[in-house]
Amino acid sequence: MHTFSKFKQYYYGIIMSQLTRFFLLAFFYYIYPVEIFPQDIPAFTDQQLIANPTDAWITNGGNTYNQRYSPLNEINTENVGSLEGVWMTHLNGSGIGARFSGEAQPIFYEGIIYVITGEDDVFAVDIDTGDIIWTYEANLFDGIEGICCGWTNRGVAIGDNKVFIGQLDGQLIALDKDNGDIVWSVQAEDWRQGYSITSAPLYYDGKVITGFAGGENGIQGKVKTYDAETGEHLWTFFTVPNPGEIGHETWPQDSEVYKYGGAPVWQTPAYDPDLEMLYFSTGNPGPDFNGWMREGDNLFATSIVAIDSNTGEYRWHFQQVHHDIWDYDAPNPVVLFDIDINGELRQGLAQASKTGWVYILDRTDGTPLIGIEERPVPQDPRQATAATQPYPIGDAFVPQEVDIAPEGYPELVNQGRIFTPFWTEGTVIKPSHNGGANWPPSSYNPNTGILYVCATDRMSFFRGGEPEEIPPRLEGRFLGGRFGAVPNFISGVFAAMDMTTNRIVWQQRWADRCYSGSITTAGGLTFVGRNDGRLTALSSRTGDSLWEFQTGAGMNSPVTTFNYNDKQYIVAYAAGNTFAGSEKGDNLWLFTIDGGISDISMLDSMSGLENFDLSSSDMANGNTIYASACSFCHGVDGEGGHGGGIALMSASNPGYVIDRIRNGFNAMPAFNGVLSREEILDVAAYVTNELASQ
């Protein structure tokens, strides 16, 4: 009589249940033949778009208020410890290359998960099985230049039986939800002129709106809106105004620098159908670090902007940084909410910025809800600096000055405080140009009034005063100076901010940058990813960590949650990120309570890799190869070495280790063809059995 291990019994049960399900379905469809297609995706109403998501997640922000809040509470603080994987699907290796980053938040509707990779490939995945239903392959031109901040895509939009995507090459495309075929496509902007699309489009009222990245490439920022049915262009709003438009007077009148003045829109706008307004924040003006070329406040750069959702006409703006010379753009998505302030219900808006502040405004007219003071700041006439800057009342969620000067850099000026000017001699300043709150989305709980912000604490060295050509050279950047993060002084900050006071409720400091974004739920949980591959669930009230799961690649995108067949699920896309230095992957995970997969090591037999057996591998030979080829980067004992490789203490999944040795990831080279199959297995055996067991 054979005795099955618990592990084998688990997979035997899965196989038998799937076979039973298959034959029952086959018999049913033999008797009652029907065609199987995904359910229709409607032209969503305004009420559907602003509702808190329950049985679906139909917009990038959960709703068009961009709150990323779920009213579901089946998964909660009491049972989250039992949260386990249901399945993990590989997305055909898409987006694993060194240049790509996985930042997309999945969409879910009627049993189908829609996700896009850093290669702009789209996958429709069956929630019941994890099977890929269809794939759209973008086949991007490999020679695209001028992409800022990695080849990435932050999500898709759905509506009217279509899946909408923006691509790095400047195309806006509508796909058939049944098969991924192109319904229509438009060349919204030209990548050769510095434009790209990295954000998820927004579907609303039969329209699709998208912004454009490229603020370092000499673009003229804008958002464009199209007819969702036909792709017809409806209107454009320029974030750097043309002559005769509101705000053009804040640019030099004797120069065409405004045509290359930046102010990109990095993220998906928010939408309030009752006020008939769209809201978004903008990036820095260009050239970034040479202010004398663009004297004036430079509207609408580094601003929050509201426009008419029907016509695109200007409604109001609030500029966070006047005449920005620090690259303090505002890529974090705008969040809308209604909140009680001093006994009065107000229609609010919040945006967490690179400056380290949350800007809280009345979304009807752009006036501050909490208070924002204009204060004098240090001056440098060579930079044509603004006389004052806005200072929100409340707490900064990251430090805004340098406590101790870093070794090897010039003496601090003004203690490296925010808004310290610089010129050709350069200086160190906090926050960094890529500190504070970057693109990773914030989440908001409407019941508590708490905004959860994912941020980075770091300092940068700024140098300005370099002239730029007008028009800019197409093959170069339009910076007007130099910048660089000061190494070894980087940490992550995850903060809970009270929107009635703009004060910190609680705060966590991480050893690495926070680069994923979050969602928050009525179950008292806030989910946020980590660069080392962990998906974590925190107590929304205290910030305590209640659960974590190793996903096998950098967890650098927000997760999605929904109810399906009376059960709450969470879907996570773990693909790594070049800027975060995290491991690359193509892993799409589904989780629920008692899902069955308690650890990634249980996936060995389902990984899709070729069959392997490490039992006869030569670990001594693996040790020898590791010492000569791997230890410099990963450390003699797998603790992480001078070459910047990750620590290997958690590398216990043989299939995963073999895949990484064979194919490489990030800066790690591929050893397929360099090492024989037996040598790869020897190294994998040594890593998983010796190093990972420490």
Residue spans for each PLM region:
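Blade/loop signatures of beta-propeller domains
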Residues: 42-86, 242-246, 409-422
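Electrostatic cytochrome c docking/interface patches
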Residues: 44-45, 603-625, 641, 694
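Repeat-blade elements of multi-bladed beta-propeller folds
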Residues: 57-61, 99-121, 146-171, 196-217, ...
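Extracytoplasmic beta-rich repeat domains
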Residues: 89-105, 135-157, 185-200, 217, ...
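C-terminal capping alpha-helices of c-type cytochrome domains
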Residues: 166, 661, 673-694
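Beta-propeller blade signature
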Residues: 222-232, 297-311, 492-498, 586-594
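Blade-level signature of beta-propeller repeat domains, shared across WD40, Kelch, NHL, RCC1
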Residues: 560-604
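Gly/Gly-Pro-rich "capping" loops immediately C-terminal to redox-active cysteine motifs
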Residues: 623, 635-674
